[in-house]
């Protein structure tokens, strides 16, 4: 999970700032929770 957080912090935030014109890192939306759901077939 740390890898994904580092990628978001280092690369995605910079791209969002340039694309939407944010002036501060605090204006960029944050990822708060990621939920995965996987079915296992017949119960």
From Swiss-Prot:
It comes from the Bacteria. One of its GO terms (molecular function) is tRNA binding. GO terms for cellular component: ribonucleoprotein complex; ribosome. Keywords: Ribonucleoprotein, Ribosomal protein, RNA-binding, rRNA-binding, tRNA-binding. Gene3D superfamilies: 3.30.1440.10. InterPro entries: Ribosomal_uL5_dom_sf. Belongs to the universal ribosomal protein uL5 family. This is one of the proteins that bind and probably mediate the attachment of the 5S RNA into the large ribosomal subunit, where it forms part of the central protuberance. In the 70S ribosome it contacts protein S13 of the 30S subunit (bridge B1b), connecting the 2 subunits; this bridge is implicated in subunit movement. Contacts the P site tRNA; the 5S rRNA and some of its associated proteins might help stabilize positioning of ribosome-bound tRNAs. Part of the 50S ribosomal subunit; part of the 5S rRNA/L5/L18/L25 subcomplex. Contacts the 5S rRNA and the P site tRNA. Forms a bridge to the 30S subunit in the 70S ribosome. This is Large ribosomal subunit protein uL5. It comes from Proteus vulgaris.
């Amino acid at each position: 999970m740390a890898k994904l957080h580092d990628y978001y912090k280092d690369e995605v935030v910079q791209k969002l700032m340039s694309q939407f014109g944010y002036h501060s890192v605090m204006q960029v939306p944050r990822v708060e929770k990621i939920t995965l759901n996987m079915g296992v077939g017949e119960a």
